[in-house]
Amino acid sequence: MYAYLKGIITKITAKYIVLETNGIGYILHVANPYAYSGQVNQEDQIYVHQVVREDAHLLYGFRSEDEKKLFLSLISVSGIGPVSALAIIAADDNAGLVQAIETKNITYLTKFPKIGKKTAQQMVLDLEGKVVVAGDDLPAKIAVQASAENQELEEAMEAMLALGYKATELKKIKKFFEGTTDTAENYIKSALKMLVK
């Protein structure tokens, strides 16, 4: 098992980043790949968790130990796999997630992707009193703050809406960029590349 990998981020896609260490490029599935945009070709330390399946060995990456702990807590719940756990972490407010678990707010929990009422109830049962968002470096917290302040991203999304792109498509793309800082022009260029794929 690996605790973390230190290396150069060489590639970012919609689902993963590539971290090169000692000449080997590791595919790391992360909650918000585009949050790493400013670190391409720079050295970074990514906390990791390995999942071994019959058909694949997968590495999941995290920006902090707190985020990794949250991921491990989520995948311990019956009905939540690694992909669903990453989708939950990528959502807007991890502090809100913890509060919803503590207050047994099933309605709030079912707003996360692929989380139905039964799984939400299981989350409360398994995680109540056990999950704490302690670090200030959780990407979702940064994303909430950046979302309120990131006028450039808002302008880019409005421009693409005016170009005829669907709001549902743009909502997904906007999530990838939350927590990053760039110009509206660069956001539009990156978004167009994603939509072409």
From Swiss-Prot:
Main localisation: cytoplasm
UniProt-listed SUPFAM superfamilies: DNA helicase RuvA subunit, C-terminal domain, Nucleic acid-binding proteins, RuvA domain 2-like
Renumbered residue ranges of the record's region Domain III: 148-197
Annotated signal peptide: none
Protein's organism: Streptococcus pneumoniae (strain Taiwan19F-14)
A single BP term in Gene Ontology: DNA repair
GO cellular component, one term: Holliday junction helicase complex
Name of this protein: Holliday junction branch migration complex subunit RuvA
